[in-house]
Every structure is written in C-alpha cells, then in structure tokens.
C-alpha cells in the first residue's frame, strides 16, 4: 500500500512516517524543508521510503506524484494562529489554496485522511461541550482556513477528517509554540509562568496518539470513511491553570494568574471525543506521560532550532 504524506518532515509527519515504515507501508514524503530540519534522516534506512524535496504548491509536479498513491495525508501547512498571522500570504497559499487545488486533482478512488482542528469551535459557553455536530465558530485565520478546507473535503468520495485537539509531546521536529510544550518548556527554562485568562479550557492529545489515529483510519478506512472525528483525550479538557497544576507534579516552578492583559488566543472550549472512541480507537498516552517525556527532551536538546516562526 502506497501512502503520500505532504509536509512529512514536520512535527506530526516526522513521527508518523517512521511508524508507517515500521509497519512496512510504502511511504512517499513531499516537503520543502523550510525550517532546515533533518528530521527524516533515520527514515532513509527503510527501502520502502521515498523523499521528494519540493514545494507542494507546484501543482503540475504534485499531480504526477499523487497518481500512484492509494492514501494521501496532507500535513503540509503553516500550523497555528501566530505563524498564520505573521505570514498571512503564505498561510492563504499553503493552508487554503493548496488544499483546495489538491482536492481537484485527487482521483475519485483515492483516499484522503485530513488533519483539521477542533479550534474551529472557537469560544464556548461555560461547561459547553462540543461534538462533531456543533456549530463552528473559528476565531483565528488558521482555524477559518481549516473550516473552509474541511467543507470542501466533504465533496470527495473517500475522506476522513480528524479535528485535532491541541497536540503535545516530543518529536524529531518538536514545536515550542504548542500550549503544553510551551508551558513545560517555560517551567523548565524560566521556572515561572504568567497566566492570562487562566480559566480558558482546551482539549489535548499526544502526538503519537495522533499518528496512531491516522494509522487506525488507514487500516479501518472502509468502516469510517466520509466522517468527521474529534481527536483528543476525553479526560483532558483542562484549563490553563489545571494544566499548570499537572506540570507542577513533575517540576517545581511558579505560576501566577494575571488579569491586566488579554490573551490574543481567545479559544475556550471543551470537546467530546466519544464518536472516535466508538470506532475502537483509544488514545494511549496522557498528559503525565507527555510532560515527563518533554522534560527529558528539553534536558538534551539545543532548542534554538525549534522555534516555529
């Protein structure tokens, strides 16, 4: 089985690719290595691995590559609200226009497993829990683009959309702008955190569970196709303050709540993941595991290479 992953050298892709290769799938990665990362070096060991250094916006080239692959996992993106605001033109061309063009050249029999985002729910009322049928209210440019992409994705014959919770955990291309990774990194390096709107809640998921979910959907595509799934850990709808309390179980640091400043990221929601749990998929890793993993990671890495923008 041949699988094409765009942006496969990134935070999720650099974990997913090796997991697929270990299962003997044939994997092709297209990536322009814009962060000068060497995150797929270990994967070159596998004879079932192919890597193409190219920009996914070169549509004619992409169309030739796509044809021979049964599954397509479009990970190529500028991920997160800050970088999309900072590089708005690139966010439009990569996150939005590229994906809409991609859908036009995909054959009706090819299968697409698409990462979208549960940040599309935006800001909920107190104790409101969002499921896949809830109204979307995206706040950031990133989330707004994902909503448009997901809507167009549903015009395909064979698709699955995974609305990812806030991802955390170690990866060969680790990101320090993600909330859990960022908080653990600040606790580790600075020893303190200032919290704004500390009651705002998010849902969380470990990067390896994200990859496990992609593999699960590849291996169980027929029974789950043409569906949208929230992907997070059901027990981890936590506020920023509760997240700090979890981190403090593993490292001593000071966190203080302040109200004099408004957080630019106004997302505040809880998410139900019951639909994906009903498929038989179940996350394996929790926050405690991820925090301990990150602390080990930060002990041994020169982190100046892992800024996202």
Residue ranges and their predicted role:
Residues 39-42, 124-128, 172-175, 207, ...:
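Short aromatic-enriched loop/helix-cap "lid" or pocket-rim segments at secondary-structure transitions
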Residues 1-164:
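N-terminal Rossmann-like NAD(P)+-binding domain of SDR-like oxidoreductases, especially those catalyzing
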Residues 126, 139, 147, 151-202, ...:
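NAD(P)-dependent short-chain dehydrogenase/reductase
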Residues 57, 120, 167-169, 210, ...:
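Conserved sequence/active-site signature of Rossmann-fold short-chain dehydrogenase/reductase
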Residues 60-63, 82, 89, 100, ...:
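Residues in well-ordered alpha-helical elements
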Residues 9, 134, 168, 199, ...:
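Structured beta->alpha junctions
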Residues 190-191, 195-309:
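C-terminal substrate-binding subdomain of Rossmann-fold SDR/epimerase-dehydratase oxidoreductases
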């Amino acid at each position: 089985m041949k699988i094409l992953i765009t942006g496969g050298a990134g935070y999720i892709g650099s974990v997913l690719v090796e997991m697929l290769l270990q299962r003997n799938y044939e994997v092709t990665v297209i990536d322009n290595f814009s962060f000068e990362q060497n995150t797929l070096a270990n994967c070159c060991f596998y004879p079932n691995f192919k890597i193409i250094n190219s920009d996914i916006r070169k549509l004619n080239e992409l169309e030739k590559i796509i044809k021979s692959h049964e599954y397509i996992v479009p990970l190529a993106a500028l991920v997160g609200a800050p970088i999309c605001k900072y590089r708005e033109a690139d966010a439009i061309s990569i996150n939005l226009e590229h994906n809409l063009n991609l859908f036009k050249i995909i054959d009706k029999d090819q299968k697409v497993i698409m990462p979208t985002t549960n940040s599309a729910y935006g800001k909920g009322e107190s104790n409101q829990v969002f499921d896949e049928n809830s109204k979307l209210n995206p706040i950031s440019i990133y989330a707004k683009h994902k909503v448009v992409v997901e809507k167009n994705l549903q015009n395909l014959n064979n698709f699955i959309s995974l609305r990812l919770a806030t991802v955390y955990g170690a990866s060969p291309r680790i990101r320090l702008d993600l909330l859990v990774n960022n908080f653990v990194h600040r606790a580790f390096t600075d020893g303190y955190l200032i919290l704004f709107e500390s009651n705002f809640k998010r849902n969380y998921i470990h990067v390896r569970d994200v990859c496990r979910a992609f593999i699960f959907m590849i291996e169980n595509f027929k029974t789950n196709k043409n569906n949208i799934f929230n992907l997070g850990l059901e027990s981890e709808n936590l506020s920023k303050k509760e997240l700090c309390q979890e981190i403090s179980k593993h490292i001593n640091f000071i966190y203080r709540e302040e109200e004099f400043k408004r957080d630019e990221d106004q997302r505040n929601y809880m998410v139900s993941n019951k639909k994906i749990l009903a498929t038989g998929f179940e996350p394996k890793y929790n926050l405690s595991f991820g925090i301990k993993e990150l602390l080990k990671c930060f002990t041994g890495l020169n982190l100046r290479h892992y800024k996202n923008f």
